[in-house]
């Protein structure tokens, strides 16, 4: 994997930095593991915008990822590593001994031809998936389930990981990359090691058009709007907001806590916020 600074042949390419991985598969993805993906452009079923700054972008198929890793005791060989336009991490196509193929999140250090395993008897090696009760304390893990059998939901982005801190009864404590310490049931599964493609954060988009290819539309500042459109809008000429920063709906931003899920608050041992 190499970091390439593009030659400044145009203003849009002057600041562009690419991450090139020559180990990725250059052909088409595995057709049996593709699904259609319609662009919603940030609209709900009424056609109203519910998520701003989304729309356009290149069409692409969804790669069906195996987040459960439930084929216990069946060895799987990594056939190839692939690029996935739907996520920051790369994916790996694995071939199980019974002939089935599945996509998984590609862990750091996993290479083509390597053998992976799932289940409570799997060795503690990068890329293997085990229940948390069978993972030694202090192990670096990723792709962590929040409920047993639901599939991995935490630590799935490129370069991320978590650490298993302790086990108490039927729960274990996991420290996430954000600093949050969370309780997870010991029957939940996790994968050993870190997520690969850790250089993803070093890339530079270089130009606005590259974000448009990804389906990201422009973000307009509130102070540049009219008063009807944003609490910061209006004024004669260039003016400051005149108040503490808020969202278009008046909710304070920059540190204001918006978490309202009281049902799972007991699962958070230490919040990611320092105070």
Swiss-Prot record:
It comes from the Bacteria. One of its GO terms (molecular function) is structural constituent of ribosome. Residues 38-59, 224-257 are annotated as: Disordered. GO terms for cellular component: large ribosomal subunit. Signal peptide: none annotated. Residues 38-53 have a biased composition (Polar residues). Keywords: Ribonucleoprotein, Ribosomal protein, RNA-binding, rRNA-binding. GO terms for biological process: cytoplasmic translation. InterPro entries: NA-bd_OB-fold (IPR012340), Rib_uL2_dom2 (IPR014722), Ribosomal_uL2 (IPR002171), Ribosomal_uL2_bac/org-type (IPR005880), Ribosomal_uL2_C (IPR022669), Ribosomal_uL2_CS (IPR022671), Ribosomal_uL2_dom3 (IPR014726), Ribosomal_uL2_RNA-bd_dom (IPR022666). Belongs to the universal ribosomal protein uL2 family. One of the primary rRNA binding proteins. Required for association of the 30S and 50S subunits to form the 70S ribosome, for tRNA binding and peptide bond formation. It has been suggested to have peptidyltransferase activity; this is somewhat controversial. Makes several contacts with the 16S rRNA in the 70S ribosome. Part of the 50S ribosomal subunit. Forms a bridge to the 30S subunit in the 70S ribosome. This is Large ribosomal subunit protein uL2. It comes from Burkholderia thailandensis (strain ATCC 700388 / DSM 13276 / CCUG 48851 / CIP 106301 / E264). The lineage of its organism: Bacteria, Pseudomonadati, Pseudomonadota, Betaproteobacteria, Burkholderiales.
């Amino acid at each position: 994997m190499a970091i390439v600074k593009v030659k400044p042949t145009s203003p849009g390419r002057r600041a562009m930095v690419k991450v090139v991985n020559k180990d990725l598969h250059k052909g088409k993805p595995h057709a049996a593991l593709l699904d259609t993906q319609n662009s919603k452009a940030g609209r709900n079923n009424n056609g109203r915008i519910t998520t701003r700054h989304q729309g356009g972008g290149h069409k692409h198929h969804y790669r069906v990822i195996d987040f459960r890793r439930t084929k216990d005791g069946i060895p799987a060989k990594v056939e190839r590593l692939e690029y996935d336009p739907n996520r920051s991490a790369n994916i790996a196509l694995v071939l199980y001994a019974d002939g089935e193929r599945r996509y998984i999140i590609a862990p750091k250090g996993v290479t083509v031809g390597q053998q992976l395993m799932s289940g409570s008897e799997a060795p503690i090696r990068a890329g293997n998936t085990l229940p948390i009760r069978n993972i030694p304390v202090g192990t670096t893990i990723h792709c962590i389930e929040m409920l047993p059998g639901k599939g991995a939901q935490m630590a799935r982005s490129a370069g991320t990981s978590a650490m298993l801190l302790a086990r108490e009864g039927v729960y274990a404590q996991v420290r996430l990359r954000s600093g949050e310490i969370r309780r997870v049931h010991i029957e939940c599964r996790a994968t050993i090691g870190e997520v690969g493609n850790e250089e993803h954060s070093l890339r530079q988009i270089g130009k606005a058009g590259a974000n448009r290819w990804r389906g990201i539309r422009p973000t307009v500042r509130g102070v540049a709007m009219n008063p009807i459109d944003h609490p910061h809008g209006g004024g004669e000429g260039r003016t400051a907001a005149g108040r503490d920063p808020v969202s278009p709906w008046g909710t304070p931003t920059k540190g204001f806590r918006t978490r309202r899920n009281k049902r799972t608050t007991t699962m958070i041992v230490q919040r990611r916020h320092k105070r």
